[in-house]
A protein has these predicted regions:
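Short beta-strand edge/turn micro-motifs at domain boundaries
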Residues: 101-132
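A solvent-exposed, acidic/Ser-Thr-rich amphipathic alpha-helical stretch
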Residues: 6, 10-12, 25-78, 100
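Residue-level signal for tight coil/turn positions that link beta-strands
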Residues: 80-82, 114
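Short, cysteine-centered beta-strand-loop-beta hairpins and adjacent loop/turn segments enriched
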Residues: 91-101
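Generic hydrophobic alpha-helical segments
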Residues: 15-16
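Hydrophobic/aromatic beta-strand elements that line small-molecule binding cavities or substrate pockets
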Residues: 57, 71-76, 89-91, 105-111
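Generic short beta-strand segments
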Residues: 35, 87-93, 126
Length: 132
């Protein structure tokens, strides 16, 4: 694994997180592969395709507000043109007048296309959520 490539994949993951947190969905779209898949926690169903993934982020951006988002324990492993990036997160958000605290682990598979990392696949696990 190339350390510069791992650092590059980690930086791409941070850019993805910043884009959805600030509602920059056009920018986020440019960081997702058109065939991206999201397997929700527990793997019950799936969202397939960039438009479906963006719809989930759009719903969040239109109906919730991120108060606080912290990522930690970010690890990126790169093999060839594929990166597996995982991180723990803690966040506080407001939705429908209620404040909630959520935590868990996010796992993304990224692939390098024309010099840029694109999201291919995502899931979340170890999730906990409760009123804040």
């Amino acid at each position: 694994m190339s350390l510069p490539e791992a650092a590059s994949a980690a930086a791409a993951m941070r850019q993805i997180n910043q884009a959805w947190q600030t509602g920059r969905l056009d920018e986020l779209a440019s960081m997702l592969h058109r065939g991206m898949v999201m397997a929700p926690p527990g793997f019950g169903g799936r969202a397939q395709g960039r438009d479906a993934i963006l719809a989930g982020f759009r719903d969040y951006c239109e109906n919730a507000r991120t108060v606080e988002f912290n990522e930690h324990d970010l690890q990126a492993d790169v093999i060839g043109d594929v990166a597996i990036v995982t991180f723990r997160y803690d966040m506080v958000y407001e939705r429908a007048g209620a404040r909630s605290r959520a935590s868990g682990r996010d796992l993304w598979v990224l692939q390098k296309h024309s010099g840029s990392w694109l999201g291919l696949w995502r899931t979340m696990f170890d999730m906990e959520e409760h009123p804040s």
